[in-house]
């Protein structure tokens, strides 16, 4: 596995990248992440007005940027990008509505719960317990299974949410996604066939594909220029904790401690995926510092007035495609997010890129993540028990992404949170099965 990963990387995590190139490649990660989607969904769930929705979006960009830079430079010290998860959205809306709504004490109660949960994560990292948990519970075969399930769980989102069920004519959606994906594949093929232009076409493949897809969508009348024109050039985030205030409610706090536990499981899968694509064995120090960085990122998000920002697995797929894993690129991505937090017109431009264009690239990214997980598993000496450790989590991942919404909605609230995170269910299943089966010796941490 090491040779394969090394040969696929053009630029390693600690390799320097010129500022201009890092800026462009950082934007490539930003475009692939769809960070604006969860806050837009949450704003709709809470019936926010235009001002509140814009404020939530700006706060999310700002928190994602600060969190990304914190993790990459000071804590995890790996190419890691932070962004909002879909998992807490239902709980967040529920807490707000149960506490008086937006005009009552709702947001203050939500932010109070988020602050306490974030502090718990920081304390977990400071205690050194997180690394011990990983060493004890997550050998290589479990880690590879989690990575595989991370990629697998994202495929339906790439296809359904961004293409088949996205706004617009479904045939146009498929056409846009196909053109974008084909452009990406052509760029990668050119980089392999003609090594002299590898740097341009491999490292810039996603930006080129998104640019082509956006131009085609504009020719179809699918690009929303009005939303861009109506947006202000510059504005400070207005909906922070200073605006909403803070309040503490025990039930809400306990709810979000559970949510944070689920998010931590997802983030662990993201770090495994990033370690696999960069051929880096995550150290004990990185595990503990990473969870401290995760907690501080979520604390920043709460102070900014938005939901937790956690590790994004999409970026591992981007690295697999582009071959660039430089931390400077991720610092640039974090800087882009901060810029987007203040420049509403630029945010509106990126948000106006049609979902099928994003989906065409996203679908390929998810597959590369899944294959990296399978590659980790392939390197292990597996026996009969491993068939169940690997297979059952994959089955459950597929089952949960295909589970009808009416079944999920009928479940108790806490179970709904778990059902909303196939990665967490897969990880817990793999860990439990591994404990029940004969012990493995290959550790990832």
Set out the residue ranges of the language-model regions.
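Hydrophobic, membrane-embedded alpha-helices of multi-pass small-molecule transporters
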Residues: 20-35, 171-184, 203-205, 209, ...
């Amino acid at each position: 596995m090491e040779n394969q990963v090394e040969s696929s990387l053009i630029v390693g995590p600690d390799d320097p990248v010129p500022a201009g190139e890092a800026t462009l490649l950082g934007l490539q990660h930003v475009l692939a992440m769809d960070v604006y989607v969860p806050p837009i969904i949450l704003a709709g769930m809470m019936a926010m007005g235009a001002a509140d929705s814009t404020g939530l979006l700006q706060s999310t960009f700002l928190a994602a940027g600060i969190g990304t830079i914190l993790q990459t430079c000071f804590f995890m010290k790996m190419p890691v990008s932070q962004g909002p998860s879909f998992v807490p959205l239902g709980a967040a809306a529920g807490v707000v509505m149960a506490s008086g709504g937006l005009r009552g004490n709702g947001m203050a109660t939500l932010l109070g719960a988020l602050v306490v949960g974030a502090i718990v994560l920081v304390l977990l990292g400071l205690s050194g317990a997180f690394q011990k948990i990983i060493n004890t519970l997550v050998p290589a075969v479990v880690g590879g299974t989690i990575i595989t399930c991370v990629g697998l769980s994202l495929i339906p989102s790439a296809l359904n949410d961004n293409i088949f069920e996205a706004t617009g004519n479904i045939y146009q959606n498929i056409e846009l996604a196909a053109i974008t994906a084909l452009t990406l594949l052509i760029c990668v093929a050119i980089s392999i066939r003609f090594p002299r232009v590898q740097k341009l076409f491999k490292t810039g493949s996603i930006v080129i594909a998104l640019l082509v897809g956006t131009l085609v969508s504009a020719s179809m009348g699918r690009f929303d220029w009005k939303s861009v024109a109506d947006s202000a050039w510059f504005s400070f985030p207005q909906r922070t904790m200073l605006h909403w205030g803070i309040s503490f409610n025990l039930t809400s706090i306990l709810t979000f401690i559970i949510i944070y536990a689920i998010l931590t499981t997802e983030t662990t899968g993201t770090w495994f995926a990033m370690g696999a694509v960069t051929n880096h064995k995550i150290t004990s120090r990185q595990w503990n510092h990473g969870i401290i960085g995760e907690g501080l990122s979520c604390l920043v998000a709460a102070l900014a007035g938005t939901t937790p920002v956690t590790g994004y697995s999409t970026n591992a797929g981007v690295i697999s495609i582009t071959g660039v894993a430089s931390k400077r690129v991720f610092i640039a991505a974090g800087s882009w997010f901060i810029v987007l937090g203040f420049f509403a017109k630029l945010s509106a431009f990126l948000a106006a890129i049609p979902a099928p264009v994003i989906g065409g690239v996203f679908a390929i990214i998810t597959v590369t993540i899944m294959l990296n997980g399978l590659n980790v598993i392939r390197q292990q000496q597996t026996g009969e028990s491993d068939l169940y450790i690997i297979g059952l989590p994959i089955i459950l991942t597929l089952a949960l992404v295909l589970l009808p919404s009416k079944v999920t909605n009928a479940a108790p609230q806490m179970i709904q949170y778990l059902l909303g995170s196939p990665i967490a269910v897969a990880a817990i299943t793999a860990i439990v099965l591994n404990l029940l089966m004969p012990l493995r010796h290959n550790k990832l941490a």
